[in-house]
A protein has these predicted regions:
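Eukaryotic intrinsically disordered, low-complexity regulatory tails and linkers enriched
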Residues: 257-298
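Pro/Ala/Gly-rich low-complexity, hydrophilic intrinsically disordered segments
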Residues: 224-258, 262-264
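TPR/TPR-like (Sel1-like) alpha-helical repeat modules
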Residues: 198-203, 214-217, 226-236
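Bacterial N-terminal signal peptides that target proteins for export
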Residues: 2-30
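Structural detector for internal amphipathic alpha-helices that build alpha-solenoid repeat scaffolds
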Residues: 45-55, 74-89, 109-123, 129-132, ...
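Short inter-helical turns and helix N-cap capping residues of alpha-solenoid HEAT/ARM repeat scaffolds
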Residues: 71-72, 106-107, 137-138, 169-171, ...
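Amphipathic alpha-helical scaffolding segments comprising HEAT/armadillo-like alpha-solenoid repeats
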Residues: 51-67, 88-103, 123-135, 154-166, ...
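C-terminal motif of bacterial Sec signal peptides marking the signal peptidase cleavage site
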Residues: 38-40
Length: 298
């Protein structure tokens, strides 16, 4: 009986492979093509939305209305971002709003955007308010606070920067930004914290700490903590006479739509001196290009 069944099974398998299986394959190909088209349509609609927005951006009144919306955190976030990036975003009324959101807003994204706004338009006296957010439970808030302290100079915040930077339980994205911020403080506690960060597990943290040490000392012992410390102990004046620090900025290569929207040319922020820092102590040879992230992965 088994000999009679096998030919039938083989015949059915052959029919399935010849007639039915190709249909499944073609259906699968159609599904894949459809998914690709839907994805490209979504991308194109997003690009066209950006193009439309560049023709008719929200008015200042609309941005302010969104930022002050007490019922919608997304509107608050969107409005705060628009105000922060406007030339007039540093007026006293808006500064008061940013400070209020940093201190009291319950939404972490709104708080992070307010920190970014204070970083752009704040004063040296805002450093303490910003530094408190390094103890926030939300990582995005802590990263925004650390980045803000790269732009706001106050030697009194070095203790909390050192504490966050040397805590290996802290998220590495926070410690990277802290290491960059410490590059503006030529002090023993900053140096010791940066040396400790060179020995941490994450390579990105190590490199950020080494960059700050090079800025502070004009020496480079790479990621050798022992060599850094022995050199430091042997020198009575280990730090540069002139400051080299500029807060870093981000740049990227222009894309297709950046060239199409010629009426709204894309510009990038240049590295600058943190508010509260004495610019007269800045070395004239400081090159802004050294503080730019060009966004290239080549």
């Amino acid at each position: 009986m088994r000999n009679h069944i096998l030919p039938a099974v083989k015949c059915n398998a052959k029919l399935w492979l010849v007639n039915i299986f190709p249909k499944y394959i073609s259906l699968g190909n159609i599904a894949l093509v459809a998914m690709a088209l839907m994805t490209s349509c979504d991308s194109m609609s997003s690009d066209f939305a950006n193009l439309t927005n560049s023709f008719s951006p929200p008015s200042p009144a609309q941005a302010a209305q969104w930022a002050l919306d007490p019922y919608d955190a997304e509107n608050q976030r969107r409005g705060t971002v628009l105000l922060a990036n406007a030339p007039w975003g540093g007026t006293p009324a808006y500064l008061a709003m940013y400070r209020l959101y940093v201190e009291d807003n319950a939404d972490p994204l709104v708080k992070a955007c307010a920190l970014d706004a204070l970083a752009r338009h704040g004063e040296a006296s805002d450093a303490q308010l910003v530094a408190k957010q390094l103890q926030n439970k939300n990582i995005q808030v802590k990263v925004a606070a650390a980045k803000a302290l790269q732009r706001i100079h106050d030697p009194q915040v070095t203790s909390i920067l050192c504490s966050r930077g040397t805590d290996e339980n802290e998220d590495s994205s926070v410690r990277i930004e802290v290491a960059i911020a410490l590059g503006q403080y030529a002090a023993d506690d900053s140096f010791q914290a940066l040396c400790a960060m060179i020995d941490q597990r994450e390579l990105a943290v190590n490199f950020a700490a080494n960059d700050s040490l090079r800025l502070l000392t004009d020496h480079d012992f790479a990621l050798d903590r022992r060599l850094w410390l022995s050199w430091y102990r042997a020198n009575k004046k280990p730090f540069r006479k002139e400051l080299q620090y500029l807060y870093p900025t981000y740049q990227r290569e222009k894309g297709f739509w950046d060239h199409i929207t010629f009426w709204a040319p894309l510009t990038f922020e240049k590295p600058g001196v943190p508010v509260g820092m004495d610019e007269s102590k800045l070395a004239p040879s400081t090159a802004p290009e050294d503080f730019q992230n060009l966004g290239n992965t080549k």
